[in-house]
Design a protein with these regions (language model features):
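Short metal-binding segments enriched for Cys and/or His
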Residues: 219-229
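Short helix-coil boundary/hinge micro-motifs
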Residues: 1-201, 232
């Protein structure tokens, strides 16, 4: 499957802030929220699904491996793409009450935030699913524990020429649906760099490296290893 034919003309306007921070809340937990002085930008988060999914998997990989700077990595991802909108597809209402946790404030407003543990777990689950596809992780005892699921809303217009309109309401759904279309494609465009191990997006079937630097570094490394074997001390 391909994301574009599945969701033609999909336009999901999403608001991100230029910087995020993690702060504890009086009711418990830590929340990823816009930083003081941050500015907002609204964009179509479904416009470039390839880099988006690759970056989501890369963050999931870092979190899965226990990166020491995981909070900084999450804040950087949010600054680039925005928060996930974890409750948006469920249609849960927002409130102006300043005493409630940030996740219940108006979506993507300056007061809105997401529990950092829930935020991180979404990326870890996505990456672990990718590992099962790669054959590097076998879920036991129940294979379905690694399955991914989500909400898919639509609207069918009335009249002589009805149109099917997908109503995707969150960045989380865009990531999940884009990933699903890519990972189930005949030629999977999500790859792991042969040199650095980074997950990247490339539609060329024979692509093995995330960039020229890694390709050159790997070739030099292979050349030196062959030279060492051919000319032992």
């Amino acid at each position: 499957m391909d994301f574009k034919p599945m969701f033609p003309s999909l336009n999901v306007l999403w608001t991100r802030w230029s910087a995020y921070q993690i702060k504890p809340h009086q009711w418990g937990g830590e929340y990823l929220i816009p930083a003081e002085g941050a500015t907002d930008l609204t964009y179509n988060c479904a416009e470039q699904p390839g880099p988006l999914v690759a970056d989501a998997l890369e963050l999931g990989q870092q979190l899965h491996m226990g990166a020491p700077d995981k909070n900084r990595l999450c804040a950087a991802f949010a600054a680039r793409y925005g928060l996930l909108g974890l409750n948006a597809e469920k249609g849960e209402g927002a409130t102006e009450d300043p005493n409630v946790p940030p996740c219940y404030r108006p979506l993507n407003s300056w007061e809105y935030g997401e529990d950092v543990s829930f935020f991180q777990s979404n990326f870890v689950m996505l990456y672990q699913h990718f590992l099962t596809v790669q054959g590097e992780l076998v879920p036991t005892p129940n294979p379905r524990v690694m399955d991914l699921s989500g909400f898919l809303s639509y609207r069918l217009t009335s009249g002589p020429n009805p149109q099917l309109v997908w109503e995707v309401r969150s960045l989380e759904s865009v990531i999940r649906f884009a990933y699903a279309s890519m990972i189930s494609a005949e030629s999977i465009p999500l790859k792991v760099c042969k040199n650095c191990g980074k997950v990247y997006y490339n539609t060329h079937a024979k692509s093995e490296f995330c960039g020229t630097k890694c390709r050159n570094y790997y070739n030099v490394k292979v050349f030196r290893e062959k030279d060492r074997i051919s000319h032992p001390d």
